[in-house]
Amino acid sequence: VRDSCEPVMQFFGFYWPEMLKCDKFPEGDVCIAMTPPNATEASKPQGTTVCPPCDNELKSEAIIEHLCASEFALRMKIKEVKKENGDKKIVPKKKKPLKLGPIKKKELKRLVLFLKNGADCPCHQLDNLSHNFLIMGRKVKSQYLLTAIHKWDKKNKE
């Protein structure tokens, strides 16, 4: 369960809870029977799934929900996106803070965001960097993790 859930949790800045770490339980003592080796594996969806922070519709309810759940929010232009250690590293060009949260003003100048475990999943918002974006996220340890990204549309008053 951990192996399938933890990567999705990390996209949003959460790690596997300490209380569920396997080494706290006696080995072989599980309440759910293990799947026999000859059982057929559940079919997995075909194709590459979109990074969860990128898989959202531009609806005001979704934006407000992300904003409330995030520690920080910025309007920004993106200079570049790189792959680094299995993550997508997002380097801002210009940024305007909307909600600073844990970001200190002096850190804002050198701010770099990470899409945790996002190196190989598509994020269509990042295909064209000429737009402004609404970026939301949270700080985990010393990294600022992107938890939602929306194209900033000046014309859409919603």
Swiss-Prot record:
Disulfide-bonded cysteines: 51-121, 68-123
GO BP: anterior/posterior pattern specification; BMP signaling pathway; bone trabecula formation; canonical Wnt signaling pathway; cellular response to BMP stimulus; cellular response to estradiol stimulus; cellular response to estrogen stimulus; cellular response to hypoxia
Span of the signal peptide: none
Gene3D superfamilies: 2.40.50.120, Frizzled cysteine-rich domain
Subcellular location: Secreted
SUPFAM superfamilies to which the protein is assigned, alphabetical: Frizzled cysteine-rich domain (SSF63501), TIMP-like (SSF50242)
Keywords: Developmental protein, Differentiation, Disulfide bond, Glycoprotein, Secreted, Wnt signaling pathway
Pfam families, sorted: NTR (PF01759)
Coarse class of the protein's main subcellular location: secreted
Record domain NTR: where: 51-158
Domain FZ per the UniProt entry, residue ranges: 1-34
GO CC terms in record: cell surface; cytosol; extracellular space
UniProt function note: Soluble frizzled-related proteins (sFRPS) function as modulators of Wnt signaling through direct interaction with Wnts. They have a role in regulating cell growth and differentiation in specific cell types. SFRP1 decreases intracellular beta-catenin levels. Has antiproliferative effects on vascular cells, in vitro and in vivo, and can induce, in vivo, an angiogenic response. In vascular cell cycle, delays the G1 phase and entry into the S phase. In kidney development, inhibits tubule formation and bud growth in metanephroi. Inhibits WNT1/WNT4-mediated TCF-dependent transcription.
Record note on quaternary structure: Interacts with WNT4, WNT1, WNT2, WNT8, MYOC and FRZD6.
Full protein name: Secreted frizzled-related protein 1
Organism: Rattus norvegicus
